[in-house]
A protein has these predicted regions:
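Acyltransferase
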Residues: 2, 192-219
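Extreme N-terminal starter segment of soluble prokaryotic enzymes
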Residues: 6-11
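Short acidic low-complexity segments
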Residues: 34-45
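Cysteine-nucleophile active-site neighborhood
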Residues: 48, 55-130, 212
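Structural motif
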Residues: 50-52, 195
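Pocket-forming structural segment of enzyme catalytic cores
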Residues: 97-181
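Beta-strand-turn-beta hairpins that frame and shape the catalytic cleft
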Residues: 154, 189-193
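Short, surface-exposed beta-strand/loop micro-motifs that present aromatic residues
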Residues: 182-189
Length: 219
């Protein structure tokens, strides 16, 4: 449990392709100590990592490698470092994406990334706006993070994306969301990793409470 928020250091990964300030402002409003960085020293000394993301998958992966954070993130997850990944940040955790050209990801989560355009017929792509989350009770980590349920049930969160993840294992899925005729994985919870396709930092109090609850549940 986190006793003193100001002493809990959060490293927001800067790989030159993301809107860092909205998540920084959200975490600061919760009184957490944040730093925007790609420094190995800062990342290693942090208590939690945030991997945000806006942009193209292949460019994002390339930038992670250029800033030497690609292998570092893989290593830290192996050692159970707490991580929050958002939108493209969530997609980069997977093995590959078909956006523009097939590109390998971090392979932290088994599965890959697909375009809505392959599955949708009547609704507009991208998926933009507020939508519900349906909890997957088969998730293997929900017992530890049980307090998250009350911040998900009957709450809406803000989405903006054209691609979605398809995890190999249902036990990694925290929530599903339905967009027209497609039911997709909208968040992952695995050990100390929370990954969201939606933007909690743009989801008002619902998003702030979800972030705060996850961090408070970390041992």
């Amino acid at each position: 449990m986190i006793d003193t928020k100001s002493k809990f250091k959060i490293a927001i990964i800067d790989y030159n392709l993301s809107n860092l300030f909205s998540i920084n402002n959200a975490l600061s409003s919760l009184n957490f100590n944040t730093i925007i960085t790609n420094s190995k020293k800062d990342i290693l000394s942090s208590d939690l990592i945030v991997l945000p993301g806006v942009g193209a998958f292949n460019k994002a992966i390339s930038n992670l490698k250029k800033t030497k954070t690609f292998d570092l993130l893989r290593s830290l997850h192996t050692h159970n470092k707490p991580i929050i990944s958002i939108c493209l940040g969530m997609q980069m955790l997977f093995e590959s994406s078909e956006e523009f050209c097939k590109t390998s990801g971090l392979s932290i989560i088994k599965g890959d990334v697909h375009s809505f355009k392959k599955y949708k017929h009547s609704s507009i792509v991208p998926h933009i706006g507020w939508n519900d989350l349906l909890i997957n009770d088969q998730n293997i980590s929900i017992k530890k993070f049980s307090r998250l349920k009350k911040h998900i049930f009957n709450k809406k969160f803000y989405f903006i994306h054209s691609f979605f993840v398809k995890p190999k294992y249902k036990k990694d899925i925290l929530t599903y969301t339905k967009y027209d005729d497609v039911v997709f994985c909208s968040s992952i919870l695995k050990n100390n990793l929370l990954a969201c396709q939606f933007h909690p930092e743009k989801s008002g109090n619902n998003g702030l409470k979800l972030i705060d609850s996850f961090i408070k549940s970390i041992n």
